[in-house]
Design a protein with these regions (language model features):
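N-terminal metal-binding scaffold of metallo-dependent hydrolase/deaminase domains
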Residues: 1-79
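His/Asp/Glu-enriched, well-ordered alpha-helical/loop segment
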Residues: 34, 288-295, 336-438
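C-terminal cap of metal-dependent C-N hydrolases
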Residues: 39, 423-484
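Active-site gating loops and adjacent loop-to-helix segments of metal-dependent hydrolytic enzymes
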Residues: 107-140, 191-205, 268-295, 315-318, ...
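Alpha-helical scaffold segments that flank or form the walls of functional sites
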Residues: 109-180, 209-225
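Metal-coordinating catalytic core of metallo-dependent amide/deamination hydrolases
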Residues: 166, 170-301
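Catalytic core of soluble alpha/beta enzymes
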Residues: 266-296, 301-317, 327-338, 354-362
């Protein structure tokens, strides 16, 4: 299929080179076709729209094709040298929001996923994370991680780092330098009965002091309410922390206004451990310690009850749905449909490296698959009416919303959609890129079909440019793609 055929589907524009990587050139007008899901399950196709981006990286206006000011606005932008036109075969998507990443586990991506969780943690994960006491080692890994995730379209990332102050701060610095929007958490884990002796905080007081200093340090390198990089309070999970530490971190969250992230009811073991220790569920315990707050991110949450979901919603917290790693280590599927029906905030997480893919587009695919298998059931030996959960599956538009606007809502950020007031975090997708698996047939495909094919088949090779805060920070176009000027 040629580029002309693609344009017959999208009615797109001729190709004009893209903008430079220059933070002074946020002020721009993008012309082309964009897809986004501004509300759960609702796909909106913006054909030949103008997206006006101000110098602060925020969208000030989206001008639809056919509106009275469209042609005049396009002409003005061209005269001012502000117009960036998408080329033939190119469309715009919102940037992807990954709610759950274990940054230090990047070197073991794709390793040891065929062993039990206990082996995975004790033999592979904890020894690897302990190595981040070496800051030079940490910087090498973290720089590769952040650049790799940006290339895969992750414009906002929520990171677990390690217990090490300097290495965790290095991750925050690298995110800022690479231009990725990020929440970075120095991990807190002090319980000697559950944490290995070579990898834990000395005690609750030390962990609290270092968390406080970490928050101050991150806010110093990225000052201001509109900063790209933020600290996030990160108790690893309830079993790894003493009561003293959990209570102290809850007070610190209230004092500093920092967001919180942790694991919640991921597995049978975790659920049982917490219930035996406290007589309550993970969600209830976190609430009791002051850690279940507005925009707290709860990774997994597979074994939550209806009461837990209601509590999570009432506190304004959110779930990071990690369908791939759930399949490997949780041995359960998150009740996504039930959470959405209860208006719980939910987004997607890759859960590197419990999940082996760094792509949140893959995360959309895994969420779709998990929903379908949960609805259909997996035990063919059972009667059909006993195999699955009714209405559990989700649509492609819902999956993409989870990866974009849903993730933004989870964090309280104006990202994930193209609307006035939102940050311009976006992906320039080229369906005709070398090696592309996206195939479009103008006699068969409507624009909505093209969207689905991109979500289900596009990959890193298709991501020509990545914008964060109105600035191009990555993509396959590279330096050559940055040198070309905007149209006049």
């Amino acid at each position: 299929m040629g580029r002309e055929a693609f344009e017959a589907v999208l009615r797109g524009s001729k190709k004009v080179p893209d903008s430079r990587r220059n933070r002074k050139l946020r002020d721009k007008v993008i012309f082309g076709t964009a897809f986004h899901t501004p509300a759960r399950g609702r796909l909106e196709v913006l054909r030949d729209a103008l997206i006006v981006v101000a110098g602060d990286g925020r969208i000030t206006e989206v001008i639809a094709q056919g509106s009275g000011d469209h042609d005049a606005a396009r002409a003005r932008a061209a005269e001012q040298g502000r117009l960036v036109e998408l080329g033939a075969g190119e469309v715009l998507l919102p940037g992807l929001v990954d709610l759950h990443i274990h940054a230090p586990q990047w070197p073991q991506l794709g390793k040891a996923l065929d062993v039990p969780l206990e082996v995975w943690l004790r033999k592979h994960t904890f020894p690897l994370e302990a190595r981040y006491a070496d800051v030079a080692f940490a910087r090498t890994i973290y720089d590769d991680l952040v650049s790799g995730l940006v290339a895969n379209g992750t414009t906002t990332a929520v990171y677990f780092a390690t217990i090490h102050m300097e290495a965790s701060l290095a991750l925050a610095e690298i995110c800022r330098a690479r231009g990725q929007r990020a929440f970075v958490g120095k991990v807190a884990m002090d319980d000697p009965d559950q944490c290995p002796p070579f990898y834990r905080d000395e005690n609750a007081a030390t962990a609290l002091d270092e968390m406080r200093r970490f928050i101050e340090a991150v806010r110093a390198i990225a000052p201001g309410g509109d900063a790209l990089v933020h600290p996030i309070i990160t108790p690893r999970f309830i079993p790894s922390c003493t009561d003293e530490l959990l209570a102290a971190l809850g007070r610190l969250a209230a004092e500093t206004g920092c967001l919180v992230q942790t694991h919640c009811s991921e597995s049978d073991w975790e659920k049982s451990f917490v219930e035996q220790r406290f007589g309550r569920s993970d969600a209830a315990v976190l609430a009791g310690f002051g850690l279940l707050r507005q925009h707290t991110v709860l990774a997994h949450s597979n074994f939550v009850s209806d009461d837990d979901l209601d509590l999570i919603r009432a506190r304004g917290a959110a779930v990071a749905h990690c369908p791939l790693s759930n399949a490997y280590f949780a041995e359960a599927v998150f009740p996504l449909r039930e959470a959405l029906d209860r208006n719980v905030r939910v987004g997607l997480g890759t859960d590197i490296s419990g999940g082996h893919s760094p792509s949140l587009l893959d995360g959309c695919r895994h969420a779709l698959m998990a929903g379908r298998m949960r609805q259909g059931g997996v035990d063919a030996g059972l009667p059909r009416d006993r195999r699955g959960v009714a209405d559990a599956r989700i649509t492609v538009a819902e999956a993409f919303w989870l990866a974009t606007a849903g993730g933004g809502e989870a964090l309280g950020l104006d990202v994930g959609k193209f609307a006035a007031g939102c940050k311009f975090d976006a992906l320039r997708i080229d369906v005709e890129a070398d090696g592309s698996n996206v195939r479009v047939w103008p006699d068969l495909d409507e624009p909505e079909d093209v969207f689905q094919k991109i979500v289900l088949n596009a990959g890193r090779a298709n991501i020509r440019q990545v914008w964060v805060d109105g600035v191009c920070v990555g993509g396959t176009a590279g330096d050559a793609g940055q040198r070309a000027s905007v149209s006049r």
